[in-house]
From Swiss-Prot:
Sample GO molecular function, one term: sequence-specific DNA binding
Basic and acidic residues bias spans: 529-548
Induction profile: Slightly induced by ethylene and salicylic acid (SA).
Protein name per its UniProtKB record: Transcription factor MYB3R-5
Pfam families: Myb_DNA-binding (PF00249)
DNA-binding region: 98-121, 150-173, 201-224
Annotated function: Transcription factor that binds 5'-AACGG-3' motifs in gene promoters. Transcription repressor that regulates organ growth. Binds to the promoters of G2/M-specific genes and to E2F target genes to prevent their expression in post-mitotic cells and to restrict the time window of their expression in proliferating cells.
Gene symbol of the encoding locus: MYB3R5
């Protein structure tokens, strides 16, 4: 076979015949039909064609070896300098005398040089994508010659070699190839085979009929390699649809819990396990955990709704932090509570009520109860002999809310009082026009009480002035008015209205509902009107004219 065994006197014709035998042997492509040869690198030949006597050591390679991937049949790769030298040698010998060509490469055989030229460096080699005509031609020739004789088949495809035709058939055109989705059984078999064979995809392909070594390699690197940790920990692969089933069951249970009532939650909770398949123990644990957590959340939400509705639909049992707050007498507190009980009874009859208390309901103390100003005017307007007009329906109650209404924002007692003051009907003109009043000088002031003009010194203590004015004003009320604990009349206005009341008394006009106004003589009324029409400088008394 080799010319090295011939004596030096051998003829050139005999040497050429021996080289032609090597070329014919390689061109007939007598490798096994298994696809294992398709995984070899382009610059390496098949293992039984390599000369072991002159094999290149692994340390001579100029490129670092791969730590993973298919096992190389040939050691070492071709450098760009070697490729250029091979081109010049093939051009010199016209691609025929491969023994002479191999002499340019001390560590390469003639077979390696031939394969490198035919599979990689030949400019006539077509490396582009396959056309439909080429695929049809391969299928037709395979029916004629069978899946063999790839060198003969390649002659009908210009620019293609037998190796390309073989790989195209086994990886794409073979009708026995499975192209559907991978099943769990196939992935488990691939896991077990990979533990035994590693990256030998041709050996793994024997375990998976219908899957090519190329498809097995792509599926392992792209998808299955990420599931390796779970497989090594449990021994099983996670089912693809189990996660969707569990999430669907939880969503269905959440929807059922929203539709169920507070007294009978989760009446359809048994349907959670009817749609789940596989891993029943884990589903049971997840269902129990979901039921308990959802029930707790629903109870907390119901208690919150009850707490807010109680605050909005019931009398405000809150102790406001107001300055100078005087204690309310026992009789006032009892009467005001009776009034609110009647109001609540009317609202319950109209269809509004308070829902039942939940477990998280907080009941504030009932001893500290403060009615609003509008309620006190409604309760004591007739007792003082005054005519308040229409009774104010406004109280410390918010707008009656229905049980089915949503959650409303909480409001402070100050906002209730402010709204009651704005919506109170028949507001006295004193409160509406108090900003137009021109006060007297800082030293003195003219006060008209019951038609009598009085000069009041501003320097005297405010406590004595407030007490005297309060006593004179309460004379207008009926004799059966009830006094407070200290003998003084009970002030119906809140503490922050005390200044407005004092300003109203200083004014030169009387309340419209004063019952004693009709009893005044005509001359006193005229005198009062004249005082009102005078300018401010005439009404005020200068400090110089003041009698000593």
């Amino acid at each position: 076979m080799s010319s090295s065994s011939n004596p030096p006197v051998c003829s050139p014709e005999k040497e050429e015949r021996s080289e032609m035998k090597i070329e014919i042997q390689c061109m007939e492509n007598k490798q096994p039909l298994a696809a294992s040869c398709s995984s070899a690198s382009e610059g390496s030949g098949c293992f039984f064609l390599k000369s072991p006597e002159i094999a290149t050591p692994a340390t001579v390679s100029s490129f670092p070896r791969r730590t993973s991937g298919p096992m190389r049949r040939a050691k070492g790769g071709w450098t760009p300098e070697e490729d250029e030298t091979l081109r010049r040698a093939v051009e010199k010998y016209k691609g025929k005398r491969w023994k002479k060509i191999a002499e340019f490469f001390p560590e390469r055989t003639e077979v390696q040089c031939l394969h490198r030229w035919q599979k990689v460096l030949n400019p006539e080699l077509v490396k582009g994508p396959w056309t439909q005509e080429e695929d049809d031609k391969i299928v037709e020739l395979v029916k004629k010659y069978g899946p063999a004789k790839w060198s003969v088949i390649a002659k009908s495809l210009p620019g293609r070699i037998g190796k390309q035709c073989r790989e195209r058939w086994h990886n794409h055109l073979n009708p026995g190839i499975r192209k559907d989705a991978w099943t769990v059984e196939e992935e488990s078999a691939l896991m077990n085979s990979h533990r035994m064979y590693g990256n030998k995809w041709a050996e793994i392909a024997k375990v998976l009929p219908g899957r090519t070594d190329n498809a097995i390699k792509n599926h392992w690197n792209s998808s299955l390699k990420k599931k390796l940790e779970f497989y090594l920990a449990t021994g099983n692969l996670p089912p693809p649809a189990s996660k969707f089933i569990v999430l669907k069951d939880i969503a269905d249970g959440d929807r059922d819990s929203k539709q169920s009532s507070a007294t009978k939650p989760f009446k359809d909770s048994d349907s959670l396990t009817q749609t789940s398949s596989g891993n029943t123990d884990s589903n049971e644990v997840g269902r129990d955990h979901f039921d308990s957590s959802s029930a707790l959340l629903e109870e907390v939400a119901a208690s919150r709704r009850i707490g807010v509705n109680e605050y909005a639909c019931s009398p405000v049992e809150y102790k406001p932090q107001l300055p100078n707050l005087e204690p309310i007498s026992e009789e006032v507190r009892i009467n005001s509570k009776a009034y609110f009980e009647r109001s609540i009874q009317r609202k319950v009859e109209n269809g509004f009520g308070t829902p039942k208390h939940g477990n998280l309901y907080y009941k504030s103390p009932l001893d500290y109860y403060f009615p609003s100003e509008a309620d006190l005017q409604h309760m004591y307007g007739y007792e003082c002999g005054c005519s308040p007009g229409a009774a104010s329906p406004v109280s410390l109650m918010t707008t009656p809310c229905n049980k089915d209404s949503g959650l409303t924002a909480t409001r402070s007692p100050e906002s209730f009082l402010r709204e009651a003051a704005r919506t109170f009907p028949n507001t006295p003109s004193i409160f509406r026009k108090r900003r137009k009043v021109v006060l007297a000088a800082k030293t003195d002031a003219v006060v008209v009480v019951n038609g009598v003009v009085k000069e009041v010194d501003r320097k005297e203590e405010s406590k004595d002035m407030r007490k005297s004015l309060l006593l004179e004003t309460t004379d207008n009320c009926s004799d059966d008015e009830e006094l407070g604990l200290n003998g003084n009349a009970f002030n119906l206005s809140p503490p922050y209205r005390l200044r407005a009341k004092r300003t109203a008394v200083i004014k030169s006009r009387q309340l419209e509902f004063t019952s004693e106004k009709e009893k005044q003589p005509d001359n006193e009324i005229e005198f009062t009107s004249a005082k009102e029409k005078q300018p401010d400088n005439e009404i005020k008394t200068s400090e110089e004219d003041k009698p000593v």
